[in-house]
Amino acid sequence: MQPGRILIYGDSNVWGDKGFGENGVPLRRYATEQQWPNILQQLLGDEYNIIQAGLCGRTAGEYVGHAPYLGGKIGYEIALREASPVSGVIIALGVNDAQNESASGEQIVADLQWYSAYTQAYAADSENGMASSGSVWYIAPAIAPVQCYAPLASKLHYINEKLRATHTTISNPLDDHDDYAPDGIHFSLQGHRRVAQAIYKAIKEGVAR
């Protein structure tokens, strides 16, 4: 029996960015085996193949003044085709959108929901060989509980609430300062491990199939 294939499509935390140190210096990238998609692969073993597609700065939508390649939709059309056929897709986007002052919570939710609609349409085309596959699961966007990001709290809460009402959404387990790098956005090593464990649990319990 062939293992299932899961595409993980997201931003810098999917890519494995260490973020910035307390002095603002970029800390580069975690080793491959320390990045949560690859930790998840280790936990799942031969049952699934994980396809990691992360990009620093990626957004769910497109914004004026941003580099076109950072808009997630065009990249997703390519990534889904490259990974197909897939058993499912995990979308880990939204925080970069929330930091954009021009982006309303409503628009971000609509942009995130696009990924599910596009995947369903892609899976429905018999030429793509996905049969009844095409489930999309979202990781609820979250950031560290630090004061400098307090203005984003209401927007992120709105996004999470709306996604949960319409789509399978896996709770982000990172609720502690130690789960994040000093910049409060990127995951620490502990954070990468905790996210991988949460996604693994969701898959094994049937929340994500």
Model-predicted regions and their roles:
Residues 1-54:
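Serine-esterase "nucleophile elbow" of acetyl-processing enzymes
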Residues 2, 34, 38, 46, ...:
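Alpha-helical cap/lid subdomain in secreted, periplasmic
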Residues 11, 17, 55-58, 93-95, ...:
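Gly/Ser/Thr-rich helix-start
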Residues 16-17, 60, 99, 146:
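Glycine/Thr-rich phosphate-binding loops of Rossmann-like dinucleotide-binding domains
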Residues 20-30, 64-68, 146-154:
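Short, flexible/disordered intra-domain loops and linkers
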Residues 52-58, 171-175:
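Acidic carboxylate-rich catalytic motifs and surrounding loops in phosphoryl-/glycosyl-chemistry enzymes
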Residues 56-66:
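N-terminal beta-loop-helix "entrance" segment that forms/cooperates
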